[in-house]
């Protein structure tokens, strides 16, 4: 984030994407772009990307009354790229995919999951592009069931499984994860490793209590489909919920 809350820059091979959603950041970028020597100039000199793509959009900007902007900020070419992280390959679309195209912030945690996955049956909940599940398979997981409410996300994850040659050990379902976990529990399907990487559960302060209930519910349901001695890997990206409150919800 370069020390600026609300500003995210992601470099993937020779393509750079950025998005911002907080008040003041848009003006900061306008000032940067208008200066003779800008931060974008410095990024070009340092990384020489073929394309810098802006995605400043979403509910946060609308709440603040900020205009949305989406498109090339510098350079030209296709906003689609194939990347490799830790030997795992992903097709990335910074134009149509989530935020900046791929969530690189969970790379370290994916590596931890990879080290725990050998021989395990895995549930990749809120799978997005399939990152956690594919790292698990790279670490020797027996099989992965990936679930996301977004059908395009599941299809992207399916394509990424094919890209890595692991389609035979990967299956995906486009379904609300809360309901999917109930169904799995009721039919007795269990997993050695359950991964829960949910989207933000609160967009405003008024939504914090509902978000905490959501974390309690989803993690209880995740535990309900674990084998005895199984592992639950869970996370939060809800900015309005601090770590102490989140851990308290998990203990509940």
Model-inferred region functions:
Residues 5-8, 12-13, 19-37:
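N-terminal targeting segments
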């Amino acid at each position: 984030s370069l020390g600026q809350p609300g500003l995210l820059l992601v470099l993937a091979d020779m393509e750079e994407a950025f998005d911002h959603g907080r008040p003041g950041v848009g003006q900061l970028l306008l000032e940067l772009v208008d200066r003779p020597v800008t931060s974008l100039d410095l990024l070009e000199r340092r990384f020489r990307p073929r394309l810098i793509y802006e995605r400043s959009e979403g509910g946060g900007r609308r709440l603040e009354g900020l205009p949305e902007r989406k498109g090339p900020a510098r350079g030209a070419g296709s906003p689609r790229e194939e990347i490799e992280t830790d030997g795992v390959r992903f097709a990335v679309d910074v134009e149509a995919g989530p935020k900046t195209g791929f969530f690189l912030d969970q790379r370290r945690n994916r590596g931890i999951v990879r080290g725990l996955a050998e021989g395990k049956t895995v549930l990749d909940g809120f799978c997005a592009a399939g990152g956690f599940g594919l790292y698990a398979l790279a670490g020797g997981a027996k099989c992965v069931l990936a679930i996301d409410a977004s059908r395009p996300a599941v299809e992207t994850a399916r394509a990424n499984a094919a890209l890595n040659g692991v389609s035979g050990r990967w299956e995906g379902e486009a379904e609300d994860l809360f309901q999917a976990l109930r169904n799995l529990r009721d039919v007795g399907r269990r997993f050695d490793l359950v991964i829960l990487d949910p989207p933000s559960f609160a967009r405003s302060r008024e939504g914090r209590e509902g978000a905490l209930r959501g974390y309690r519910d989803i993690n209880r349901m995740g535990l309900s489909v674990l084998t005895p001695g199984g592992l639950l890997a869970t996370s939060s990206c809800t900015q309005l919920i601090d770590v102490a409150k989140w851990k308290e919800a998990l203990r509940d």
